[in-house]
Amino acid sequence: LQLFHPEYDVQGVGKMIMEAGIAGQLAAKAKAANDVEEAEKQQKICDELTKGAYAKLHHDMQHFVTEASVEQLTAIKNSIAQCARKAQKAGIDAIEIHGDRLLGSLCSTVLNHRTDNYGGSLENRTRYALEVLQAIKEAAPSMMVEYKLPIITVNPDGSLRGKGGLLEDEAVEFAKMLDAAGIDMIQVAQANHTGNMGDTIPPMGAVPYNWTLGACEKVKAVVHCPVATVGRVVSVEAGEKILEDGTADIIGYG
């Protein structure tokens, strides 16, 4: 979830994508009925809507971010809780809170410059994430809840890799908070929010294999819930060794 500048019409994009899907279905039905003219007409509508939606989405998000109001944050939290409630009703067993994106932006000292209860101290910056967790647990008490914990890592030259998340020491402290709040599982991952795909999917040789494992091990040492690692774990053998060494409980391959 992101909040963009007012002219970035997120709902409008969603409507365009939905209408493109409908037009695509109508085109397929017309083609199946050998109605070439109608099929071409609907396919053209589908293509134009899809192109327009992607054009609106294709930009650097950082240039469009605004500070979310408390009212907006509350509305988003309530929507997330409603989604969790519906998921539980549908028979879903587990839900992952993606700790990057909006939550990671609020946690991050790089992106969060607020001066209210959601900015400044670690307690304030992580407040919203914990509120979201609590809202989900209240809305869907029988669901297993995982938190994807993004770590801002440090490159060999001292520069930061990733923006939306927490530096390692703060991430370990936040993991304790999540554990105390009743999280069922934590996945330690690389933070992103940089606009550079190479930060989260680094070029071959740019970072070592299993490069988030050190942070994962530190998190695992302070919590009681299972902890997963992800980040250039590319073979079954590597994953098995991590499990045998006890540095993580679950492996995210890739």
Regions found by a protein language model. Name each.
Residues L1-Y253:
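Flavin-dependent oxidoreductase catalytic cores
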